[in-house]
Amino acid sequence: MARSLKKGPFADDHLLKKVDDLNKTGSKTVIKTWSRRSTIFPQMVSHTIAVHDGRRHVPVYVTEDMVGHKLGEFVATRTFRGHGKDEKKSRK
């Protein structure tokens, strides 16, 4: 179920503060965050945000197409290792 339109988009305050500080100084350092639930805003475009996937921080370069989506959509939390081998096929 989608978020109510009257509430507006959500982003953690600490993340927005870091982005605003970088925009004021003009630097392009990587922002490390655990906030996968935050919505990407237009002021985040052209920044690199390292999003936590449960094990490590994965860098995500934010483009204009990503605005309105969540940060967690661009970093997978599960890795597919493949299905188990069939014993009958491996014996032959």
UniProtKB/Swiss-Prot annotation:
UniProt cross-references to Pfam families, sorted A to Z: Ribosomal_S19
Keywords (A to Z) from UniProt: Ribonucleoprotein, Ribosomal protein, RNA-binding, rRNA-binding
UniProt KW Ribosomal protein keyword: yes
The protein, known as: Small ribosomal subunit protein uS19
InterPro entries registered for this protein in UniProt: Ribosomal_uS19 (IPR002222), Ribosomal_uS19_bac-type (IPR005732), Ribosomal_uS19_CS (IPR020934), Ribosomal_uS19_SF (IPR023575)
GO cellular component, one term: cytoplasm
Gene Ontology molecular-function annotations: rRNA binding; structural constituent of ribosome
Lineage, top ranks: Bacteria, Bacillati, Bacillota, Clostridia, Lachnospirales
GO BP terms, alphabetized: ribosomal small subunit assembly; translation
SUPFAM superfamilies xrefs: Ribosomal protein S19
Disulfide bonds: none
Family, similarity comment: Belongs to the universal ribosomal protein uS19 family.
Function (record text): Protein S19 forms a complex with S13 that binds strongly to the 16S ribosomal RNA.
PROSITE patterns from the UniProt entry: RIBOSOMAL_S19 (PS00323)
Domain of life where this protein originates: Bacteria
